[in-house]
């Protein structure tokens, strides 16, 4: 569908598994640009006032003040979205590290594969019995990235609040449907789980999505005004541009 195509474009650039790693580069540059811009804008804000737009100046100065004003107002939001986007680009690597460092400690547990597994409903019921207030979100099958060779991993979500976005895995013996363990997710897995809905504005329903869309449009305005300033700079050097900010 067109929506899924846009999601894939945003998340992978349609490049497959390498896409998120490629996207990590502009994410880092975006954060660096925000931090350096805040450092440059700081002296001007102390002198003229926060989000000040000067009147009676050149068109380029008007664009500069618009760029600075919009960027200063939504700086914190852009940093949050940039940082969570960067975390998301590392998602597969983070999960793989978790599998090798912590899930691997359960690798030898469980019944060796016999070609027959317990019914999936029985496996899910065993996980829910461990956490009655939680709801199943997805099941990772043996041999997949988020499970082991001898066990299914049932990932549960809490009933409300932050627990709704943090997964709790329950490892179930694939043959006997016995609970092998329920390791608490480490901080970096929780950070990944929380960053995904925060990046896309999924915490507050439609209202937050509308706010996120407006902030996205404002960010586009910041980027466009920055491009206009770069193109119109002409022969001005970096020292001239800094002087124009402070003028």
Segments the model singles out, each with a brief description of its role:
Residues 1-247:
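Conserved histidines in hydrophobic membrane contexts and catalytic metal-binding motifs
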């Amino acid at each position: 569908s067109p929506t899924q195509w846009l999601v894939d474009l945003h998340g992978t650039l349609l490049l497959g598994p390498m896409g998120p790693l490629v996207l990590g580069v502009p994410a880092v540059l975006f954060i660096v640009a925000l931090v350096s811009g805040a450092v440059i804008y700081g002296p001007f804000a102390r002198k003229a006032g926060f989000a000040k737009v000067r009147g009676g100046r050149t068109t380029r100065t008007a664009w500069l003040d618009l760029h600075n004003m919009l960027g200063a107002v939504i700086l914190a939001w852009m940093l949050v979205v940039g940082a969570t986007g960067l975390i998301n680009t590392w998602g597969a690597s983070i999960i793989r590290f978790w599998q090798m460092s912590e899930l691997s400690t359960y690798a030898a547990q469980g019944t060796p594969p016999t070609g027959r597994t317990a019914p999936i409903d029985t496996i899910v019921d065993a996980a829910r019995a461990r956490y009655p207030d939680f709801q199943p979100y997805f099941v990772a099958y043996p041999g997949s990235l988020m499970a082991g060779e001898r066990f299914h991993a049932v990932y549960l979500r809490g009933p409300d609040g932050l627990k709704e976005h943090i997964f709790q895995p329950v490892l179930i013996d694939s043959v006997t449907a016995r609970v092998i363990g329920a390791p608490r997710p480490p901080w970096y897995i929780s950070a990944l789980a929380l960053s995904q809905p925060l990046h896309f504005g999924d915490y507050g329903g439609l209202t937050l999505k509308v706010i996120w869309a407006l902030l996205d449009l404002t960010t586009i305005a910041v980027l466009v005004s920055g491009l206009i300033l770069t193109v119109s700079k002409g022969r001005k050097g970096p020292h001239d541009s800094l002087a124009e900010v402070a003028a």
